[in-house]
């Protein structure tokens, strides 16, 4: 096939007549190299040193051109401090393929690059190394290009330098031109084969970290899908690996035990320069260890101490130089291997082409019917064809390559089956979710706070069980029709996994239905209990909690029998689990009732004041009490106060159990005027979770109530004193008033105006007396006199002559008026 031009898919501007397209390309390239637009660098580029020259000599001593590797590293104290916290990266690729240019852009190095004006000769000789990054956390190796004319057919040096890079690098980049993909020599596949073999031989005695190989496809073409390029390269790699003869302990080891592979691509450097720079800057992020998508994962780190890197590199290079195990197989074996491999590749390609229709079906998301029958037949035909064509070659090689071909074919079918299984799993998962959701939506309609019947849920429990059985049966049949015989053992786990997922989905649906049923029951029972206990909370009687407990016990006995029946018929719960769920449900309902009591805390001051007034300020008929001299105010006051504080004590604790009645949260005093106080610590045996009013709330409420109690008590004493006055007027005083006021009495009777005025004033006084308003009138008169006197004194105080005198007999008292007003109120 003709070689594809690198500029085939790009459009060039018209060229000057005096320059050829080649000349202009060279000019553009040189200008790009010398242009300041190349890369914006935040620090001085690192030139690095040549650690292995073109003759294979290691930089173990200083020369006039460069220091030794040891001294170079010692001059980088920031690198020495890193210990093993750094990463190494190298690059492989053909000569003059832009490896050094790529490294310079990625790592801010200054490796020597190609100048086409001087010819396409070798620019990198041997191996160069530089430290990159602000903290010198990346070691960069620039390797001499492969397939160069300078070394002609001598491949041993490039193999050794490649193997050297594998031994020290966490990440190894392989620089490929896109048009070289698929070419065994041009794409360095022959070199990779040698690298794989020697890698196993050199490190067979120790467990070494894996190496990440990153293929960088240069000058990508627009009409070639990158996914296809990636697949082609991986197919080449897997074919190479299948031909590698590993040591005995690694016979069955897959390639990913030793290597991981990733792929990326870049546009043409000259024709799409700005796109190239932009994508290289994106690629830089992959080489940032702090990036979550970094190439520098811990499993790739070779864990070589920074201060021992120079010694390690020198020793490993000497080991590679002295390696004697690079001889090729015998000619006959080589011919057999080559031809069998070629035939195997051809048959594999034909097989791959023959199943493209099935691949398209799977790619579109459709399932292949009779997958097992279709692909088993094709694999058998391909292996039979291979035997016919290779019967003249070495039997051992034929059998070996046949086994490899069978693995490849089965691997390809296995990859297709993975997609088939993925689609089947997705379809069955969608079906499970859809059918279970339909059932869930149906039983959700049963929710009704006014009614609860567990038997209605039993119907949907049976429907869930039937649906699960049908889906499992269909899944088994579909799986058996799709799994080839050679995948039977491998796919058992997948089959069991899906069956497990179906079971999990079923158990989840049953659990959700049980939860809905339990929530339905809880809401139903709460809506039944709360209206029945609310009147007891409002009544504030001593038997409040007893009545509440009676209501709850009755409803619990009747209700939880239904819930237990629902658990038994609608779920697979055992006896202990059912008891546990019922216990949780009871706790939830009791907590909801407790919340109802807690919400009434804001009404508690009003309820307690009303309770005190009903007992102290009102009589048995509900009328305001008229205090007589013979009434025992103290006894009634303490009785009302004790009763009120008992109500407060009931609200302090959630007394849902009969044993809770024993706990006391307030202390009543009878000596002097000491106020009641709340107990600071919980009574012994009390549950803190049941406390409704904490100590601070109780204390604040009691202080408020004490003020209210004392005001009521003082008012009662004053009314009692007023009522005693009318019984204390002497009889002789009445006779003297009548005797000396007789003339005035006759004058009033004979004067109509005075008589009417006397009747009005007397009637008012009588009504006030009957209504016990004497104290109010007295206070009001005192208030008027006090205000008048205060106003007069304040006016006289403004006159300088009277100010000293007024200050002596009438000192300022801003609270005097306020206290009088408060007394009147």
From Swiss-Prot:
Cytoplasmic topological intervals: 1-728, 774-825
Span of the signal peptide: none
Keyword Repeat in annotation: no
Any matching Pfam family: RHD3_GTPase
Stretches assigned to coiled coil: 373-397
Record family assignment: Belongs to the TRAFAC class dynamin-like GTPase superfamily. GB1/RHD3 GTPase family. RHD3 subfamily.
Name used for this protein in its record: Protein SEY1 homolog 2
Native source organism of the sequence: Entamoeba histolytica (strain ATCC 30459 / HM-1:IMSS / ABRM)
